[in-house]
Amino acid sequence: MLKINVKKQLGQLALEANLQIPARGVTALFGLSGSGKTSLINLVSGLVHPDEGYISLNERVLVDQSKAVCIPAYQRHIGYVFQDARLFPHYTVKGNLCYGIKKIDLAKFDDIVSLLGIGHLLKRYPITLSGGEKQRVAIGRALLTQPEILLMDEPLSALDLPRKRELMSYLETLSKKIDIPILYVTHSIEELLRLAEYVVLLDEGKVRAFDRLESIWENPLFLPWKLEDEQSAVLSLPILHNNTGYQVTALGLQQQQIWIKAQQAEVGENIRICIKGSDVSLSLTQPEKTSIRNILHGKVKRIVERENRVDVQIEIDEKPIWATISKWALEDLALQLGQPVFAQIKAVSVL
């Protein structure tokens, strides 16, 4: 676990953070440009020193200003992947991967090369690589130092969309395979939804919220990053079973299930989905003889009337789902808080 309790004055920005980052998985630092995201991971890495406070990693103190303790960056056992790959142009890919490592664990080397899909690049030089390939090599180099945590500072920001999505797939696999935490800086909603398990929401140097992604998505502080004309819910649910005949997969709620297109994943593995309010309609009675496969019962939790629509939050097995309806429909159904309803979900997006 990474424990952070620091203060740092950076020009006009007063950075303050008190966090306990989980021991594995991806924790995203999210916020506007200039909110302190990169500065915070630079404090963790040792590239910047705090004015006050301490940082510890797996109970090992990295810095404690009250005791004048400050471990140098190169002794912190931290891997850092920057926005640009920062490869040595005169070394091959293999040379870059092995740079600065006294003794290479060949089995680990092969595993990382295979995981990142860079085996065919080992004899090539950085000038011949695409942006995505360079970043995969940079990630491999960081992992081969056997770090206790991996810091990633917007590693996809310099890539075009196809390369970005290609590398994101590798990062998804990487986050599930390696047994260390990843602290990931981004201001991209797509990256957040695809990669993050936990989110630190930063604004003007302050931690405004820290929670699982699904909870942050519902947090009012996150509203500036969501589409104004649409509500949505993000859920992470386990696979119950796969129906090979119909090519669909069932995800489990407490007492109900949600059907999605077939997934190449094991039973019990969590799948993250997004349900848009515009894809959900409501009924006071259970619909019959309908083509809609996902019909779930729940209770009205919130009613938010807007200028040209009404957003109704339904609690289904303790999970929030939004339905966007008209004011006419609200009056016709006479919806009240706590009222039982059936939610008809027309579409589910897998993230």
From Swiss-Prot:
GO terms for molecular function: ABC-type molybdate transporter activity; ATP binding; ATP hydrolysis activity. Signal peptide: none annotated. It catalyses: molybdate(out) + ATP + H2O = molybdate(in) + ADP + phosphate + H(+). ATP binds at residues 31-38. Its EC number is 7.3.2.5. It holds the Pfam family TOBE. GO terms for cellular component: plasma membrane. Belongs to the ABC transporter superfamily. Molybdate importer (TC 3.A.1.8) family. Part of the ABC transporter complex ModABC involved in molybdenum import. Responsible for energy coupling to the transport system. This is Molybdenum import ATP-binding protein ModC. It comes from Pasteurella multocida (strain Pm70).
